[in-house]
């Protein structure tokens, strides 16, 4: 139960942070490009890398709680792209280049395809 509460609390913080970055990006740069999402994804990747290294070096009994709160919760609420980026980086570090290429290519193409599928289904169901 503790882990669920950590995920929920972290997710709330991450989601609020994502929203605030999006609002600020819109205010600063306008709406002609998805600056907020781009900034969140790049920042999320950087923060996930810092977190992964910190957790690996830190160790200790509370390591799992920090991972759940910050990695799953905060970063999950902030951007799931950071988890995708970490998984890809780990594959590359293991020299699993084909796996990393397949994973990144399939993730991007199939995610965009899934969006179109969802749009199509919603339009048919709701006659939008």
From Swiss-Prot:
Keyword Phosphoprotein: no
Topological type in the membrane: Multi-pass membrane protein
GO CC aspect terms: plasma membrane
GO biological process entries: cellular detoxification of fluoride
Example GO molecular function: metal ion binding
Reaction catalysis annotation: fluoride(in) = fluoride(out)
Main location: membrane
Regulation of activity: Na(+) is not transported, but it plays an essential structural role and its presence is essential for fluoride channel function.
Keywords tagged on the record: Cell inner membrane, Cell membrane, Ion channel, Ion transport, Membrane, Metal-binding, Sodium, Transmembrane, Transmembrane helix, Transport
Transmembrane annotation, as ranges: 4-24, 37-57, 72-92, 101-121
HAMAP family xrefs: FluC
Role summary: Fluoride-specific ion channel. Important for reducing fluoride concentration in the cell, thus reducing its toxicity.
Protein name per its UniProtKB record: Fluoride-specific ion channel FluC
Species annotation: Caulobacter sp. (strain K31)
């Amino acid at each position: 139960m503790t882990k669920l509460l950590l995920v929920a609390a972290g997710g709330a913080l991450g989601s609020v942070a994502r929203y605030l970055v999006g609002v600020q990006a819109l205010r600063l740069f306008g709406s002609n490009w998805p600056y907020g999402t781009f900034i969140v994804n790049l920042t999320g990747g950087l923060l996930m890398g810092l977190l992964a290294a910190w957790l690996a070096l830190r160790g200790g009994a509370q390591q799992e709680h920090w991972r759940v709160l910050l990695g799953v919760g905060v970063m999950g609420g902030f951007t799931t792209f950071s988890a995708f980026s970490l998984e890809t980086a780990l594959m590359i570090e293991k020299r699993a280049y084909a796996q990393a290429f397949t994973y990144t290519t399939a993730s991007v193409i199939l995610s965009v395809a899934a969006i179109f599928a969802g749009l199509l289904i919603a339009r048919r169901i709701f006659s939008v």
